[in-house]
């Protein structure tokens, strides 16, 4: 499968700059900007390319309903009800504490729409779990993915 994802990145013209800090067994990956549904597909390809098979992500609850719910869970997704105050931070911190290796990727914008400020959940999760934050940036103009690691 890794070969297919690498071929996808190559055919689409994407390059990955910098190295992922593989010494980290636990971290929060903040990915931005989140402007396209293609971010998810490119993210899956990057995950495979970097061999981050145990990477998890948060996604809006609507993605996990219906026929694609199984797929999103299978690739590491956890549904989040963005309009409910159900203490997602505590739930995710529990997952960090229960696992020897746990990497969580999410978009600080929380949406594909243009926003004036980032949501701070990624910071609160990392702080409460005592794990570093690794930044990833998708530069669509230059088809380059940057990792600004810990």
Region locations from a protein language model:
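Soluble catalytic domains of membrane acyltransferases
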Residues: 11, 15-150
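N-terminal membrane-anchoring alpha-helices
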Residues: 1-15
């Amino acid at each position: 499968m890794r070969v297919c994802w690498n071929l996808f990145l190559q055919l689409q013209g994407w390059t990955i700059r910098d190295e992922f800090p593989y010494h980290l067994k636990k971290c929060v990956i903040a990915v931005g900007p989140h402007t396209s549904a293609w971010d998810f597909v490119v993210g899956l390809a990057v995950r495979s390319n970097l061999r981050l098979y145990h990477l998890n992500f948060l996604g809006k609850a609507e993605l996990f309903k219906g026929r694609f719910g199984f797929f999103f869970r299978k690739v590491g997704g956890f549904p989040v009800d963005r309009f409910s105050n159900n203490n997602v931070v505590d739930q995710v911190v529990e997952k960090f504490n229960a696992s020897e290796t746990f990497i969580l990727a999410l978009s600080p914008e929380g949406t594909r729409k243009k926003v004036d400020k980032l949501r701070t959940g990624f910071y609160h999760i990392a702080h409460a779990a005592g794990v570093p934050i690794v930044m990833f940036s998708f530069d669509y103009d230059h088809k380059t993915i940057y990792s600004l690691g810990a």
